[in-house]
């Protein structure tokens, strides 16, 4: 009797879990929370490698909001290298003002609190993963309506867990790469929405 009760409970639980996993809203929540759990261990990291160049030792970022005009005017490394030829001190130019402006705003409010910088990096990576899920589901829905969500869910989890992203998420400076892909995915989603709206 007890064995049958356990077996029935097991299958009911599996059925409930199965229904949750194929539920699109639940998948969205998981896709957002999974990277947070995956990279939670980076929250206690300090600034490392290029984080010092773009945040901690960058004169323009450490000025906070008042450094934004110089961030917009000069190469990314200028605030760190403090020389007129900063663009040539390192091979190739590095004009990436968006992330430095974001860092300046964060620095204005929390200073050198690496925990907050790492937390924001993980949150933006989670938003990127959610956006990738939405894009894949939208692209697959017309050809594979029954499988679009599960395929998108698994593909996004694979993307989130791939070790190649560790450097981007664990180093705060990697936010420029997260932003690049995230804004590209958002642009693609907007294009698809515009196409759908024009069909109506």
Question: Which stretches of residues belong to each language-model region?
Answer:
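Cationic, low-complexity basic patches in intrinsically disordered or flexible, solvent-exposed regions
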Residues: 3
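Polytopic membrane enzymes that build or remodel cell-surface glycoconjugates and lipids
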Residues: 7, 12-200
